[in-house]
Amino acid sequence: MSDTLRLLLQLISIAPILEQTFGHDWQSYRDELLELSGRLERDGCSAALDKDLDAFLARLLVNATEEAKGAIRKAMMPVEDKETWRAGGDFYVAGAGLGTKAMPALPDHVVEVPVFYGTDREASDGNDHFGGRRGDVVSYGVARVTVPTEGRDLGELTSPKWWKLEFKADPERHVILSSVDGCSRAGFVADLQSTLATADENDLLLFVHGYNVTFTDAARRAAQLAVDLKFRGRTLLFSWASAADPKLYTVDEATIDWSEHHFRAFVQLALTETGASRLHVLAHSMGNRALVRALEHIDTGALPRGSASLCQVIFAAPDIDAAKFKDLAALFHGRADRCTLYASSGDVALKASKLIHGYARAGEAEDSLVIVDGVDTVDASRVDTSLLGLRHSYFGSERSILSDIAALLNDRKEPSLRFDVKAVGAPPRQYWAYRE
């Protein structure tokens, strides 16, 4: 029996439970489930069917009650695996939690990335380590993530799939958060200085995530980016207290504003206390709101002697008001060696944000494309791809996007010297677009 058939049969078997919990809304889900079953019977298994089934499950779980979510997850796993499944998550973390057994020796094509994190999330007792509520202090530490370099598409943040009946993460196939070790601020700085001294480059890459992201997934994404970009320095993560719930967009908006001064202090630490030569910052989506505010307030020309230079600043799909971004860009002009903005005309999440706010977002392209002095704007519409089903994570999920970012970070090339992009128009309205 195929994995797809087994999952469809299991979903059909719990239909009475789902009908009771969804009420009148179950009718549309039932019809879609029957349509998927009919396609399997008619056409057999296919990549398209698996993709649609995955999307169906995602919608089902987003809108389900906690009782229904439990029924769905329990139906999709063997009895012996139910106790090892992390409630509320999408993959199993082997040996997660402080003080647990170490992971076995890793295969040659798997690398472990230490992600040095700062977070203002509230600590959690579970495998999530940090939850979606605001904490009283900024916590520091190292999250260790294993990343396979083979059997995974460049940019892909792999994890087990329910519908493939994968219930445990496999280091040879999946990006896994293997451990999280907290420490004091002083210990964090000392450890970072020590490991930076052994790096191939005396550089730091700081990643700040966007809306609807858990601490675990933020750490996994930071490590995946470091590996796929072939970054030769050390990796930092600032994880603000996103609620990690697509229905709580406005909650995340309030939290990123609250978190901005914590992020700014973390950037200051990276610049002035680590001994790094260069700091690169990559912000995604709503995380750009904290980044632009930090750039507004940090005068890199007035940093103490021996501080790192703020080298490459990357605004990836920024979910910030376009007019506000333009105003702030004038204030932080010249504070980094180079600023680059990646935009797209096919970003559904940004279009949804525009619908909510009534005004264009800085990450949109076409008529809304932001072109300002001091920022290299790249229209990534031609190579845009989807990681979340919303065409919103192309910055980390498309080969040519990653190649261009790698040229920025590793070779510090200006756009005219980068292979993937070409100039469109002339100054002062010049921007860059991907070659056909």
Question: What are the language-model segments listed below?
Answer:
Residues 206-210:
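The conserved beta1-alpha1 loop
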Residues 17-28, 42-48, 62-69:
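Charged, low-complexity interaction regions
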